[in-house]
């Protein structure tokens, strides 16, 4: 998962405004790249960079000051509270020297220590997250500057350094207290030590009340309201603390007679020795609100617990009887009336605690008596922090909302009707907590403007936040309350419909449209909501957001003056990034790092000098400006003694919603000794099985994981050298405290990779890759939780013909878009009026080449005896049953389509090669049988095929005799020998993903991935002795990365449905994920379903901006006009069925391109 998202999700909600503004700093860095893509005079470029960097470091310094100030303030306050506990316990040199008078006092101390531990932990979490943010943003800046400086190597950019991270962290940040966290760590260690000592010592409590079993005895008397019996325990010598504690029990039991007995002995309702400064009302209300003693609570290890949420009794304490008869009885007897609103050491009144715990009736009594006695000024708002704020700056209303107590909130607002609330940001808090009732109260009773925005913090409205968090009920309520749909945040200029579209929230998009939200506007980067939705694979949402003027979607990178001007949203910056030359900014598209610019420069030299095989064209500077780099040969691959382990936490399957790292709940009492209540991390280490030494440094991941599939697009990798394999290593998963210097291992899981997957036969594997192993606690060997993961080992490929000597590139950015023949001359379709050549046949490939196809595309699979053959479907329907290819031998497979006539009676290869026209009647079709028995046999075979799933789903079968000019099946080896050397091969390596295998009902077993790829590569290196151009492609992500890592010369394209069809592997689920995957594994580019780029042509520039080739496929490509739309947008190649028609249709466009290139440029 990208840091930008985890940064937000890992923040302490009530401290969110004090974090560094990572998003804003990231936007400034991206503005450098936007300037690089425009026609800025290179002489002015150093000035542009200098100005941008000045803005960046100014904002960065303000963020550092904000984080440091907040951290120091909080630490000082928390440390003061901790020192007070040290004094009470006499804690020094690791020893507790004082005894506690009662178990109740001990419980109170433990409660305070646990709260302080939570506070220090949150503060440490706050510091660590900001520190990591500063490192990340400076690293991102250095990476961007390195890329730009290498690109503009001829321009002197004085004073600009690309080593800011090291310099700035060392001189400016690391010296500050929050950056090292030593003081907070020491405080946490002290608290942990005290709690551990208290749990193991029995002599800490020294009961001062002389009656044996007095607590049990007194509790029984109070429960029965036995005031006569209670009198025997109440004496003049009873301490004030004891009397207050006993009065609290009597009030809880509503025992009014016992209250009278205790009342007569009490002088005051507070004890000066109370180390929290709390009086009776504080203590009583806290006791009313608590469901259980805090040490008995269950927590999820490693998660941030919100200490401000009052107990587990539900909204407004609904799971507990809120009937404070005892409290009301005492209030009516009270003389010292100011006690009901007295503050403790944390500046909290009893009303604060009543609001925190959602005690509706108690809150009402306190407010009513406070107003009646003149203690509450009704002219002051209940959320006025200057009057009602505690040490955290929280008022009773804040606490009620944070605790999600709607009735308590309504009660507080009830006496505040005349006043408008002073903290309108409570509206945004209520939305984040998904509480419609509270939201309604704030708008109606609190008079908060429904369109309030926090200008200093991203300018997000309640409607925007509700849309972002996918709360349809809140969105509908806000829209009914006249929320403005056109107010957006100030980072990307996104209105609510942008965020809903990008996340694929269809219900919210429909609601926003219904209430008139504009969706033909663009954000700061010039992108429409529809384009954001399409990029992320939400094509159902895309169709809802079609602009009224559909021509807004068209994009011409060659003639930008033809592009219609786009209307920015009200939230967009006054000047959109972009330029007159047609460059498209992608700053809000979650861009990946730019490729190395020296590769670009080398590529353009080759393009200029080595274009003899193509249309002779010069590349104008104007055109150079637009093109991003295309990869060259010699990409990183595995040496013969190396292998790679790729480990994915969780799974790549979007249907699997199991948590990758699941930790069982533990009691807080247990967490004292185990440190499970601290922030936790997962340390993953690859170790040598015999020596236990790490093979590579461990990879540390912070818990909890917010994205269950985030690791899929960026798996954890361990490189094994010196011929090490999975047989020689183990993987350890250690649960460790995130912030402690000495990383104690709390729990461990161990995976023996050799035996992790169930064996299903030689050179075979199960398509189910998920592995679950238990985490064993280190102290008592209990099961702490479970880890789920997948792994893939990439083994090296060895062949004597493999080398990286060739330094040019197969794929040059040509003037005319390439045409690639789909399955040869085209995919066979049912109902075609013209005669079709059989798909994936030699005749079809030759015909495609003769008609002008640069490459022919075909599918390769392995037979049972491991021979690569050319065949498209996963199951071979010609057999009459749904049988997978890997269960048929070559002989069986080839026999299914062997003609009964002599070859001379089928099709004239010479005619196909020449491309001459012949009358259809002159062909001898393969279903003209000379023998009735053979005819009957063929009919029976065709009839059997109609029972297969392929036939039932499609109504036909490609290369079927009678519906096409059918021919023999062919092996990959034969194709190399039969097709002309000038015809390039686009080899689609066909391998089923789990969901595809399940859809085809073909069983969930496949050929071992390494063996599968190695077998195909061996045939290619054996046969390709003439330097034929070869490009690989595959829908299977693992096949693509194996092909990339096993050899250095043949480029790989990743095939993607781009959201046009459901794909459950997250890497194949959208165009955005396809781009990320291709970039990560150094692939040449992507082959996308054409529909996505026809709907939103500008997305081609997202692909190109990453230095990736963009190819499309699909029936839409058979329409020349649709092919032209893609070509104008920058698509490199189209895979088509109608080779001749599309090639002729594109000729006009190519001539236009010639005129464009030959025209003078400024």
Swiss-Prot record:
Q: What is its EC number?
A: 3.1.4.2
UniProt xrefs under InterPro entries: Ankyrin_rpt, Ankyrin_rpt-contain_sf, GDPD, GP_PDE_dom, PLC-like_Pdiesterase_TIM-brl, SPX_dom
Q: Which UniProt keywords apply?
A: ANK repeat, Cytoplasm, Hydrolase, Repeat
- State what the entry records as the consequence of deleting this gene: Results in altered glycerophosphocholine catabolism. Leads to hypersensitivity to 5-fluorouracil (5-FU).
What triggers its expression? Answer: Expression is positively regulated by the transcription factor PHO4. Induced during early phase of biofilm formation.
Gene3D superfamilies, alphabetized: Ankyrin repeat-containing domain, Phosphatidylinositol (PI) phosphodiesterase
Q: ANK repeat boundaries?
A: 346-375, 392-421, 423-452, 458-487, 492-521, 525-554
Q: Which reaction does it catalyse?
A: sn-glycerol 3-phosphocholine + H2O = sn-glycerol 3-phosphate + choline + H(+)
Q: Which domain of life is it from?
A: Eukaryota
Against Pfam families, the record matches this protein to: Ank_2, C2_GDE1, GDPD, SPX
- SUPFAM superfamilies recorded: Ankyrin repeat (SSF48403), PLC-like phosphodiesterases (SSF51695)
Q: Report the locations given in the UniProt record.
A: Cytoplasm
What GO MF terms are annotated?
glycerophosphocholine phosphodiesterase activity
Where would I find the SPX domain in this sequence?
Answer: 1-155
What's the family?
Belongs to the GDE1 family.
The name of this protein is Glycerophosphocholine phosphodiesterase GDE1
Please give the organism. Candida albicans (strain SC5314 / ATCC MYA-2876)
């Amino acid at each position: 998962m990208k840091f930008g998202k985890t940064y937000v999700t890992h923040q302490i909600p009530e401290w969110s405004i004090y974090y560094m503004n990572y998003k804003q700093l990231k936007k400034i860095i991206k503005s450098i790249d936007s300037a690089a893509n425009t026609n800025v005079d290179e002489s002015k470029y150093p000035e542009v960079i200098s100005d941008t960097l000045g803005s960046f470091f100014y904002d960065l310094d303000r963020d550092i000051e904000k984080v440091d100030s907040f951290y120091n303030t909080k630490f000082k306050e928390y440390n003061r509270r901790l020192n007070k506990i040290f004094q009470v316990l006499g804690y020094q040199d690791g020893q507790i020297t004082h005894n506690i008078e009662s178990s109740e006092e001990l419980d109170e101390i433990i409660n305070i220590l646990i709260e302080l531990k939570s506070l220090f932990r949150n503060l440490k979490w706050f510091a660590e997250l900001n520190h990591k943010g500063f490192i990340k943003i400076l690293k991102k800046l250095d990476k961007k500057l390195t890329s730009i400086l290498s690109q503009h190597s001829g321009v002197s950019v004085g004073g600009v350094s690309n080593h800011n991270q090291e310099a700035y962290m060392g001189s400016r940040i690391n010296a500050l207290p929050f950056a090292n966290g030593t003081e907070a760590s020491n405080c946490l260690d002290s608290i942990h030590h005290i709690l551990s000592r208290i749990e193991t010592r029995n002599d800490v409590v020294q009961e001062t009340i002389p009656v044996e079993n007095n607590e049990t005895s007194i509790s029984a008397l109070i429960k029965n309201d036995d005031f006569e019996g209670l009198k025997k325990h109440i004496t003049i010598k009873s301490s004030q603390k004891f009397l207050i504690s006993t009065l609290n029990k009597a009030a809880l039991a509503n025992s009014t007679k016992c209250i009278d007995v205790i009342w007569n002995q009490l002088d005051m309702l507070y004890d000066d020795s109370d180390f929290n400064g709390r009086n009776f009302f504080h203590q009583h209300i806290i006791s009313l609100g608590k469901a259980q003693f805090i040490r008995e609570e269950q927590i999820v290890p490693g998660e941030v617990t919100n200490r401000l949420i009052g107990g587990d009794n539900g909204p407004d304490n609904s799971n507990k009887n809120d009937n404070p008869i005892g409290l009301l009885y005492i209030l009516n007897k009270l003389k010292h009336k100011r006690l009901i609103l007295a503050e403790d050491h944390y500046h909290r009144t009893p009303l604060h605690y009543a609001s925190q715990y959602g005690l509706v009736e108690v809150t009402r009594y306190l407010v009513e008596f406070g107003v009646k006695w003149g203690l509450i000024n009704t002219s002051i708002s209940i959320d006025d922090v200057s009057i009602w704020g505690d040490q955290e700056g929280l008022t009773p209303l804040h606490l009620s909302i944070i605790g999600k107590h709607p009735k308590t909130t309504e009660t507080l607002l009830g006496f505040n009707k005349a006043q408008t609330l002073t903290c309108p940001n409570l509206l945004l808090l209520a939305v984040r907590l998904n509480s419609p009732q509270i939201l309604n109260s704030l708008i109606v009773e609190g008079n908060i403007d429904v369109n309030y925005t926090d200008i200093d913090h991203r300018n997000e409205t309640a409607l925007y936040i509700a849309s972002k968090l996918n709360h349809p009920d809140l969105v509908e309520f806000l829209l009914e309350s006249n929320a403005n749909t056109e107010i957006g945040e100030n980072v990307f200029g996104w209105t609510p419909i942008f965020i809903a579209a990008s996340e694929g929230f269809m219900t919210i998009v429909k609601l926003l449209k219904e209430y008139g939200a504009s969706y033909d506007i663009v954000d700061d980067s010039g992108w429409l909501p529809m384009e954001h939705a399409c990029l992320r694979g939400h094509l159902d949402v895309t169709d809802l957001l079609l602009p009224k003027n559909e021509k807004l979607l068209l994009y011409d990178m060659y003639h930008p003056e033809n592009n219609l001007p786009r209307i920015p949203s009200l939230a967009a910056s006054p000047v959109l990034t972009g330029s007159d030359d047609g460059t498209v900014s992608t700053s809000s598209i979650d861009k990946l790092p730019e490729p190395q610019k020296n590769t670009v420069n080398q590529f353009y030299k080759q393009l200029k000098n080595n274009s003899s095989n193509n249309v002779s064209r010069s590349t104008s500077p104007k055109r150079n400006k637009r093109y991003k780099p295309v990869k060259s040969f010699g990409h990183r691959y595995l040496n013969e003694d190396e292998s790679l382990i790729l480990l994915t936490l969780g799974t790549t399957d979007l249907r699997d919603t199991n948590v990758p790292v699941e930790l069982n709940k533990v009691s807080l009492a247990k967490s004292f000794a185990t440190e499970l209540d601290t922030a936790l991390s997962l340390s993953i280490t690859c170790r040598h099985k015999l020596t236990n030494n790490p093979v590579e440094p461990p990879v540390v991941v912070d818990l909890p994981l917010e994205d269950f599939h985030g690791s899929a697009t960026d798996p954890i990798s361990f490189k094994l050298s010196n011929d090490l394999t999975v047989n020689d290593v183990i993987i350890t998963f250690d649960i460790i405290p995130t912030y402690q210097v000495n990383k104690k291992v709390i729990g461990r899981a161990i995976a023996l990779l050799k035996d992790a997957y169930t064996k299903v036969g030689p050179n075979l594997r199960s398509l189910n890759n998920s592995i679950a192993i238990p985490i064993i606690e280190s102290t008592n060997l209990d099961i702490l939780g479970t880890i789920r993961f997948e792994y893939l080992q990439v083994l090296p490929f060895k062949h004597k013909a493999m080398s990286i000597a060739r330094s040019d590139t197969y794929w040059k950015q040509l003037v005319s878009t390439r045409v690639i023949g789909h399955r040869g001359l085209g995919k066979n379709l049912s109902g075609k009026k013209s005669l079709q050549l059989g798909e994936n046949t030699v005749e079809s490939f030759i015909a495609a080449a003769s008609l002008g196809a640069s490459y022919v595309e075909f599918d390769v699979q392995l037979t049972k005896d491991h021979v690569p053959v050319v065949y498209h479907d996963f199951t071979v329907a010609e057999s009459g049953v749904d049988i997978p290819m890997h269960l048929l031998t070559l002989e069986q497979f080839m026999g299914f389509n062997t003609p009964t006539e002599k070859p001379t009676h089928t099709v004239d290869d010479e005619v196909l090669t020449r491309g001459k026209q012949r009358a259809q009647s002159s062909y001898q079709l393969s279903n003209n049988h000379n023998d009735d028995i053979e005819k009957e046999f063929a009919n029976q075979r065709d009839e059997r095929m109609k029972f297969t799933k392929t036939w039932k789903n499609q109504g036909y079968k490609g290369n079927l005799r009678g519906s096409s000019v059918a021919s023999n099946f062919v092996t990959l080896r034969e194709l190399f020998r039969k097709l002309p050397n000038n015809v390039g091969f686009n080899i689609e390596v066909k391998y089923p993903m789990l969901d595809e295998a399940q859809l085809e009902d073909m069983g969930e077993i496949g050929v071992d991935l390494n063996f599968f790829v190695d077998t195909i590569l061996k045939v290619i290196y054996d046969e390709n002795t003439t330097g034929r151009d070869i490009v690989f492609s595959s829908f299977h992500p693992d096949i693509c990365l194996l092909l990339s890592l096993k050899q250095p010369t043949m480029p790989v394209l990743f095939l993607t449905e781009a959201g046009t069809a459901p794909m459950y592997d997250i890497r194949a689920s959208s165009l955005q994920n396809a781009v990320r995957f291709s970039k990560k594994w150094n692939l040449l580019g992507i082959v996308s379903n054409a529909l996505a780029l026809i709907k939103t042509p500008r997305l081609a520039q997202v692909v190109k901006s990453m230095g990736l080739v963009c190819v499309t496929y699909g029936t839409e490509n058979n329409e020349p006009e649709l092919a032209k739309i893609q070509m104008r947008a920058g698509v490199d190649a189209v895979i088509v069925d109608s080779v001749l028609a599309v090639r002729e249709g594109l000729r006009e466009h190519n001539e236009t391109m010639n005129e464009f290139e030959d025209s003078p440029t400024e």
